[in-house]
């Protein structure tokens, strides 16, 4: 019975995050990652050489291979992986279909402006509310 309820919960959660999950699957096809791991929250974390930074959409996080090394004991222990998979992944679970218009759109606009219009500072990117919240949820201290 417990296993059945867990399966139902996972199905409901996948549907709750369906817009992000669909977009995440599309981006997986585009970026064709080379390495995959499962994060602590059950999200899938992919490392792709074609990805410039990182993005989390529902159960799927795609992170630049720049942040991955073969000799890593725990690749998901990096701040970038925690920020993406655990931080933004938890935001997606909380907000469901509101994640893309609230967090996703804000983050994309911020990423486009940061460094181009807004002056670059060390860890300044992570001071924006969506990124600061993702760091907090992911347990990242900068």
Predicted regions and their residues:
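Charged, low-complexity, helix/coiled-coil-prone segments
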Residues: 18-27, 73-85
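Short amphipathic alpha-helical segments and their helix-coil junctions
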Residues: 1-5, 83, 87
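Metalloprotease/metallohydrolase-associated module, dominated by Zn2+-dependent proteases
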Residues: 2-52, 100-142
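Catalytic Zn2+-binding segment of zinc metalloproteases
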Residues: 85-103
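Alpha-helical architecture
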Residues: 57, 81-82, 86, 129
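Short pre-active-site segment immediately N-terminal to the catalytic Zn-binding motif
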Residues: 51-54, 61-82
């Amino acid at each position: 019975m417990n296993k059945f309820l867990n399966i139902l919960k996972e199905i409901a959660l996948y549907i709750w995050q369906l817009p992000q999950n669909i977009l995440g699957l599309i981006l997986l096809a585009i970026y064709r990652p080379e390495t995959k791991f499962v994060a602590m929250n059950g999200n899938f974390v992919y490392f792709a050489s074609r990805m410039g930074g990182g993005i989390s959409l529902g159960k799927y996080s795609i992170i630049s291979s720049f942040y991955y090394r073969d000799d890593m004991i725990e690749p998901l222990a990096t701040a970038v992986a925690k920020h993406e998979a655990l931080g933004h992944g938890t935001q997606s679970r909380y907000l469901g279909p509101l994640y893309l218009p609230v967090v996703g759109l804000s983050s994309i606009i911020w990423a486009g402006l940061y460094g181009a219009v807004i002056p670059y500072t060390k860890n300044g990117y992570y001071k924006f509310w969506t990124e600061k919240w993702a760091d907090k949820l992911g347990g990242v201290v900068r």
